């Protein structure tokens, strides 16, 4: 399975996020899952790429030209897919991936989550987004989605499009379908 991972490129975050991300990368490689990611050499993106490669897995980086020109490309990509901008990157990641996992991240990660989820709700695809809720990172986002649903701003149950995994075991089960 090709698992797209959305996550932070920031280095200055809770060290536990790096530890949990390494565990996920190891699990992905050991279970034959390919990593599809933004292909950056920083933060959790770098961490997941290194963990997958260190355990014999395959990395597919969808790299915007701005990242490439800035010398911020993950150095050990098996496949590099160049793209013009972040919108192209999301579109290419959608076509390249079977499922999406969101690790802790910022505005870019939120953009990726909601772009994929919105496309699902409209019917462009039927791929799931999983919020890997490391240390409760996504709790406020989950509360926001619940509040929006309560106010009838979301049709149906948002959990039909976005699922939540509290730990690696739950994540593994959700990835198996």
Residue ranges and their predicted role:
Residues 88-123, 130:
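Active-site/ligand-binding-proximal alpha/beta "capping" segment
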Residues 59, 124-127:
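Short, structured loop/turn "capping" segments at alpha-beta junctions
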Residues 1-96, 132-176:
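A cross-family phosphate/adenosyl-ligand binding-site feature
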């Amino acid at each position: 399975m090709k698992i797209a991972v959305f996550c932070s490129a920031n280095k200055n975050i809770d060290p536990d996020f790096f530890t949990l991300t390494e565990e996920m990368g190891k699990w992905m490689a050991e279970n034959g899952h390919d990593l599809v990611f933004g292909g950056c050499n920083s933060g959790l993106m770098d961490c997941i790429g290194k963990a997958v490669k260190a355990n014999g897995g395959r990395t597919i980086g969808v790299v915007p030209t701005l990242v490439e020109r800035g010398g911020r490309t993950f150095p050990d990509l098996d496949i590099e897919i160049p793209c013009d901008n972040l919108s192209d990157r999301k579109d290419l990641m959608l076509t390249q991936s079977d499922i999406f996992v969101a690790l802790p991240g910022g505005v870019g990660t939120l953009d990726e989550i909601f772009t994929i989820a919105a496309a699902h709700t409209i019917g462009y695809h039927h791929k799931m987004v999983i919020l890997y809720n490391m240390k409760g990172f996504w709790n406020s986002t989950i509360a926001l989605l619940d509040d929006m649903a309560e106010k009838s701003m979301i049709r149906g149950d948002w959990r039909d499009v976005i699922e939540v995994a509290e730990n690696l075991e739950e994540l593994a089960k959700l990835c198996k379908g």
